[in-house]
Amino acid sequence: MAVGKNKRLTKGGKKGAKKKVVDPFSKKDWYDVKAPAMFNIRNIGKTLVTRTQGTKIASDGLKGRVFEVSLADLQNDEVAFRKFKLITEDVQGKNCLTNFHGMDLTRDKMCSMVKKWQTMIEAHVDVKTTDGYLLRLFCVGFTKKRNNQIRKTSYAQHQQVRQIRKKMMEIMTREVQTNDLKEVVNKLIPDSIGKDIEKACQSIYPLHDVFVRKVKMLKKPKFELGKLMELHGEGGSSGKAAGDETGAKVERADGYEPPVQESV
């Protein structure tokens, strides 16, 4: 037998000895995720990230994270078939400030709308907002029976489908091109674009279940902290403790003007 140390025994002690288990969560911190001021409920949840160690900074690990939230959770509403994607753009204290990143309908809603004996009409268009965001909007609509119609089917002719698709693209382009991202999101929350399309297409063929089913973010302008702060209002910029920050609508009469103050 060769004279020398048995490396295996001296190095690790007992063969197959267990390593000391370190809880990975002890090195992590919780951050609050804040939605922009367009939504009623601002505090949408928490996210984990490893603490800053050397050159690895925690805030860099948070930037670019995408959160998918139901509109029901953002608006404290019952209608829950719209999902909004929010992306973290900046970190202030323990708050992740997010911006709109996309929208989608839930799978069960889409499946419930597709039925027999009707025509499904889809359209998509790439549009740039006034503040430089390039969005791709997808729209869907379905034909319905006319009043007093006896026939079971309600299929649109190819020419009518083309006219409706053209109308969809025109309305989506018009609604997005003339507004900034904040105003576009405010239109997507109640889906006023879908309702406008439904009204405009009644003369061609009656439609129902018209929705902007998806919005994709294709290009963004250069990040500006000032614009993000505007989206979040004062609540996003201050490092307040987490809590349910909810906004409430103030009802005012038409033509309301605030009273003039004598002294400031």
Curated annotation (Swiss-Prot):
In-chain residues carrying the UniProt-annotated modification ADP-ribosyltyrosine: 155
Identify the stretch(es) annotated as Disordered: 233-264
Where does the record place it? Cytoplasm; Nucleus; Nucleus, Nucleolus
Phosphoserine: residues bearing it: 237, 263
- Residues recorded with modification N6-acetyllysine: 34, 56, 249
Provide the primary localization. cytoplasm
Q: Which InterPro entries match?
A: Ribosomal_eS1 (IPR001593), Ribosomal_eS1_CS (IPR018281), Ribosomal_eS1_euk (IPR027500)
**Sites of the modification Phosphotyrosine?**
256
Entry superkingdom: Eukaryota
What does the UniProt record tell us about how this protein is modified after translation? ADP-ribosylated at Tyr-155 by PARP1 in presence of HPF1.
Q: Mind listing the UniProt keywords for this protein, alphabetically?
A: Acetylation, ADP-ribosylation, Cytoplasm, Differentiation, Isopeptide bond, Nucleus, Phosphoprotein, Ribonucleoprotein, Ribosomal protein, Ubl conjugation
From start to end residue, where is composition biased (Basic and acidic residues)?
242-255
Q: Where is the signal peptide?
A: none
Which GO-annotated molecular functions does the record name? mRNA 5'-UTR binding; structural constituent of ribosome
Gene Ontology CC entries for this record: cytoplasm; cytosol; cytosolic small ribosomal subunit; endoplasmic reticulum; nucleolus; nucleus; postsynapse; ribonucleoprotein complex
Q: Enter cross-link residues for Glycyl lysine isopeptide (Lys-Gly) (interchain with G-Cter in SUMO2).
A: 34, 249
Biological process according to GO: cell differentiation; cytoplasmic translation; negative regulation of apoptotic process; ribosomal small subunit biogenesis; translation
Family, according to the entry, reads as follows: Belongs to the eukaryotic ribosomal protein eS1 family.
Free-text function comment from the UniProt entry: Component of the small ribosomal subunit. The ribosome is a large ribonucleoprotein complex responsible for the synthesis of proteins in the cell. Part of the small subunit (SSU) processome, first precursor of the small eukaryotic ribosomal subunit. During the assembly of the SSU processome in the nucleolus, many ribosome biogenesis factors, an RNA chaperone and ribosomal proteins associate with the nascent pre-rRNA and work in concert to generate RNA folding, modifications, rearrangements and cleavage as well as targeted degradation of pre-ribosomal RNA by the RNA exosome.
Q: What quaternary structure, including any partners, is listed in this protein's UniProt entry?
A: Component of the small ribosomal subunit. Mature ribosomes consist of a small (40S) and a large (60S) subunit. The 40S subunit contains about 33 different proteins and 1 molecule of RNA (18S). The 60S subunit contains about 49 different proteins and 3 molecules of RNA (28S, 5.8S and 5S). Identified in a IGF2BP1-dependent mRNP granule complex containing untranslated mRNAs. Binds with high affinity to IPO4. Interacts with DDIT3. Part of the small subunit (SSU) processome, composed of more than 70 proteins and the RNA chaperone small nucleolar RNA (snoRNA) U3.
Q: Could you identify this protein by its name?
A: Small ribosomal subunit protein eS1
